[in-house]
């Protein structure tokens, strides 16, 4: 058995670290199989040496987050514990130091995981970035945040967001109403990110000036998109032909981010995903990056990680090795 004590700088810091009703400490006890005793600003752990060491590292990581004004939400604490188990809690500072943007309500945006940080670095460095991962990893929201930042910095003159309207088979002419009414239901997730980052009023003004364009993928055909930050969301639902069409729209001074989840393909049976195809065909092209986010990067409710993991395992069990090659290569 080993024992370690930690004296925090103040009662206020201790209260924030411990959480409401010592919630965070109870999580640490369960995760690392240690016993914790809290007295004032002092915290004492007892248990197996490696477990006590990991628990102390987790507290160090939480202190780092608090010093950088990062709220200790449940998922943040769980990620901190995950890094502490591998002795990487010091890398949390890399996340808090990586500033992306500020929302319309003044909330600063930082990557919440090391995978997200890698994704942002790839977007900054490359003309084309593929962000592939399950729901909840922030791949679309962070891409939109980077687009808004580039627009505000005048690195680009417009933002273009698109996704395949696969639910309507992209045959939007058969739907009632004008174009905007037809496509809004399929593009709503993209609007949500823009509203959060810009505010509804600013978004509307930029939209009316055509500085922001949100449109289904079918409406990209035949265009050259210069000086723009272009995001293709839900790319797993493109065909190889659609993906090639989209990527070749890129013009001078533009940056492209393609996001998707290869476990959520809604294409007709036996139709190959354009995302899987592109990941394979373009893997060695300079200036094109591929970042794989995993369940470790999920920043929603803790159950989402377990749900994602279960579905991925089921998909791998059902998928022939040849079809899965583009998904499994270069996994982080």
Please place each PLM-identified region on the residue numbering.
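Hydrophobic side chains in well-ordered alpha-helices
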Residues: 17, 55-58, 243-246
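Interdomain "pre-motor" coupling segment immediately N-terminal to P-loop NTPase/helicase cores
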Residues: 37-96
């Amino acid at each position: 058995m080993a024992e370690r004590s930690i004296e925090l700088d103040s009662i206020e810091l201790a209260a924030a670290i411990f959480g409401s009703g010592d919630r965070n400490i109870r999580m640490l006890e369960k995760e690392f199989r240690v016993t914790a005793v809290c007295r004032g600003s002092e915290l004492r752990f007892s248990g197996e040496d490696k477990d006590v060491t990991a628990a102390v590292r987790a507290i160090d990581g939480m202190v780092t987050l608090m010093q950088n004004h990062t709220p200790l939400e449940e998922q943040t604490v769980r990620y901190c514990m995950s890094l502490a188990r591998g002795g990487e809690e010091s890398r949390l500072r890399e996340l808090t130091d990586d500033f992306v943007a500020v929302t319309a309500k003044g909330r600063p945006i930082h990557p919440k995981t090391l995978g997200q940080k890698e994704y942002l670095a790839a977007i900054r460095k490359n003309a084309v970035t593929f962000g592939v991962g399950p729901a909840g990893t922030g791949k679309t929201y962070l891409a939109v945040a980077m687009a808004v930042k580039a627009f505000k910095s005048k690195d680009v003159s417009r933002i273009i967001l698109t996704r395949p309207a696969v639910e309507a088979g992209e045959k939007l002419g058969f739907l009632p109403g004008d174009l905007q009414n037809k496509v809004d239901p399929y593009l709503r997730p993209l609007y949500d990110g823009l509203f959060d980052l810009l505010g509804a009023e600013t978004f509307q003004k930029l939209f009316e000036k055509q500085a922001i364009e949100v449109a289904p993928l079918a409406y990209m055909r035949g265009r050259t998109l210069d000086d723009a930050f272009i995001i293709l969301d839900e790319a797993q639902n493109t065909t190889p032909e659609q993906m090639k069409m989209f990527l070749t729209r890129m013009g001078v001074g533009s940056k492209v981010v393609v996001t998707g989840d290869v476990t959520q393909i809604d294409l007709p049976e036996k139709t190959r995903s354009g995302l899987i195809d592109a990941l394979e065909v373009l893997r060695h092209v300079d200036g094109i990056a591929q970042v794989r986010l995993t369940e470790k990067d999920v920043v929603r409710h803790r159950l989402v990680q377990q749900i994602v993991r279960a579905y991925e395992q089921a998909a791998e069990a059902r998928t022939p090795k040849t079809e899965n090659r583009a998904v499994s290569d270069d996994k982080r």
